[in-house]
Amino acid sequence: MDRISGLPDEVLVKILSFVPTKVAVSTSILSKRWEFLWMWLTKLKFGSKRYSESEFKRLQCFLDRNLPLHRAPVIESFRLVLSDSHFKPEDIRMWVVVAVSRYIRELKIYSSHYGEKQNILPSSLYTCKSLVILKLDGGVLLDVPRMVCLPSLKTLELKGVRYFKQGSLQRLLCNCPVLEDLVVNLSHHDNMGKLTVIVPSLQRLSLSTPSSREFVIDTPSLLSFQLVDRNDNSHTFLIENMPKLREAYINVPFADIKSLIGSITSVKRLAISSEVGYGEGFIFNHLEELTLWNKYSSNLLVWFLKNSPNLRELMLVSETDDHENLGMLSWNQPSIVPECMLSSLQKFTWFKYLGRPQDRDIAVYILKNACRLRTATIKSDTRLFTKLEMITELRLSSQASSTCELNFS
C-alpha cells in the first residue's frame, strides 16, 4: 500500500476510476494521503435498488456533506439510484445543482415511485450547456420551465416519468437542437395525451406505450425507429417526414397501423410483430432483412414476400403462450411465386420451429421456390425424437437452389 501511496495523485485517481464509487470512497479511511482523492473522480454513481432504509439515510447524509465539496472541475457522469420514499425532492435537486455547476455531461436518475411523482430536477438543469446525455427512469415529474436551452444534449431517455403538462415534452424537445437519440416509455398516468416528436436532428427514436395514443412525428433525419405497444391498442399516426429511415422494429400485434406502414417503406431492415393486414399500394423496394413474429396467421408473411422484391434475408419467430396452439394456424400459399423468391432471397432462418403441418408447409414452400437460397437454418426447442422427424421431412423436400446448405439446431 505504501508503494501505491507514493504514486502521483493523477495516477491514484485513475486507479480509483476503475472501481465502484462506493469502494473508491471507502479508501478515504486508509490514510490522510487517500482522504480526499475520491473527490477528484469525474464519474460518480450513488445508491442501489437493494439499499435498505438505513443505507439510504447514510447516503443522504454523505451526499449532503460531501458532494458540495467535490473537487473535480468537470463531472463526466453522475448517476443516482434512489427510493423517493427516503429522500425529499429538495435534497435531490440540490445534488443535481452541484453536478450542473461542475459542467456535467451525463446525468442518470432512477427513482422508484411508491406515491406521487416528485419534481426533483432544478431549473438550472434545463439550461445546462455541457449536458450531453440525460436519462430519467421512474418517479420523476418533468416540469419543463419556460427557459430551456440544452445545446449539447444528444441522448434523452424518459422511462415511466410523468409530465407536468401535456406540452412539457414538446417544449423540451424544441430546445434540443442536436438531439440524436430519444427513448420515451410512456405509462398509464403520464399526463401525456398526444405524443408529438418534431426534431430535425433526431436519428434514433424508440417509443413504448401501454395505452391508445395519437402520435405526431416529424423527423427528417431519422435512421432507426422502434414502436412497442404493451397492451394491443389502436393508435393514430401522423408522420410527416422519415425519408432517411433505414431500420424499424414494430411490435404492435393487434393494432391497425396502416397510417404508419407507408412511412417505413424505405427501410433496409425491418422486424415486425403484427396480425393486421396493410392493404395494397405499399412496396418495400429497399428491404433486405425481414424478421416476422407471428402467432396466428401467415397472411403477413405472404404480404411481405409479395411486396419486398429485393429481400435477401428472412427470419421467422414462432410465438405463443398456449402450447396446444403453437405455430401459424393457416398458410395461404401465394398464387404466383414472389419476385424475391426467384431472384434475391439468400438466407432463411426459423426460430422456435415446431413442425406443425402449416409450419412445415411454409418451410417446404420456401425451400422449393427460393432459387438463390444459400443457407436455411431451422432452430427448434422440441424433443429430440420430434426434431429428428422434422429434419427428415425437410431434408426429403425438393430445393430450388442446388447450393443451399440446410442446417438444424
Swiss-Prot record:
<dbReference type="InterPro" id="IPR053781">
    <property type="entry name" value="F-box_AtFBL13-like"/>
</dbReference>
<dbReference type="Pfam" id="PF00646">
    <property type="entry name" value="F-box"/>
</dbReference>
<feature type="domain" description="FBD">
    <location>
        <begin position="330"/>
        <end position="379"/>
    </location>
</feature>
<dbReference type="Pfam" id="PF08387">
    <property type="entry name" value="FBD"/>
</dbReference>
<dbReference type="InterPro" id="IPR001810">
    <property type="entry name" value="F-box_dom"/>
</dbReference>
<protein>
    <recommendedName>
        <fullName>FBD-associated F-box protein At4g10400</fullName>
    </recommendedName>
</protein>
<dbReference type="InterPro" id="IPR055411">
    <property type="entry name" value="LRR_FXL15/At3g58940/PEG3-like"/>
</dbReference>
<dbReference type="Pfam" id="PF24758">
    <property type="entry name" value="LRR_At5g56370"/>
</dbReference>
<dbReference type="InterPro" id="IPR006566">
    <property type="entry name" value="FBD"/>
</dbReference>
<dbReference type="InterPro" id="IPR032675">
    <property type="entry name" value="LRR_dom_sf"/>
</dbReference>
<dbReference type="InterPro" id="IPR036047">
    <property type="entry name" value="F-box-like_dom_sf"/>
</dbReference>
<feature type="domain" description="F-box">
    <location>
        <begin position="1"/>
        <end position="47"/>
    </location>
</feature>
<dbReference type="InterPro" id="IPR050232">
    <property type="entry name" value="FBL13/AtMIF1-like"/>
</dbReference>
